């Protein structure tokens, strides 16, 4: 399961379960996630989850800026469209989020082959 976690001062304030498809973020009421912030455009960004053709129950994730006024940031860099990796920081206006994939094995213990 993909989770979008709202981060405040390094701690998780809330999380949203995501599913396949487009997830819009912006100030307007019609967005999947509405952010009440003057630095956020009406339709600011879209996170897209597409089922991976080779790995069952995993998704390819991308984030697209929708020509917002103040930009969409991933790991402090502005992006127009980018493939997203597990745990990267997304900043929209004053809001910070991280996407987590329960199926991702990033950061798990290293396994060594027998010698």
Model-derived features: positions:
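Short, exposed beta-strand/loop patches in secreted or surface proteins that constitute
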Residues: 14-16
């Amino acid at each position: 399961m993909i989770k979008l976690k709202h981060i405040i001062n390094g701690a998780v304030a809330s999380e949203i379960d995501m599913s396949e498809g487009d997830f819009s973020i912006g100030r307007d009421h019609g967005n999947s996630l509405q952010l009440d912030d003057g630095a956020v455009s009406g339709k600011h960004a879209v996170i897209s989850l597409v089922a991976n053709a080779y790995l069952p129950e995993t998704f390819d994730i991308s984030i697209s800026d929708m020509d917002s006024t103040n930009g969409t940031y991933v790991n402090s860099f502005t992006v127009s469209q980018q493939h997203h990796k597990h745990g990267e920081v997304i900043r929209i206006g004053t809001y910070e989020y991280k996407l987590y994939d329960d199926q991702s094995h990033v950061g798990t213990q290293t396994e060594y082959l027998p010698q």
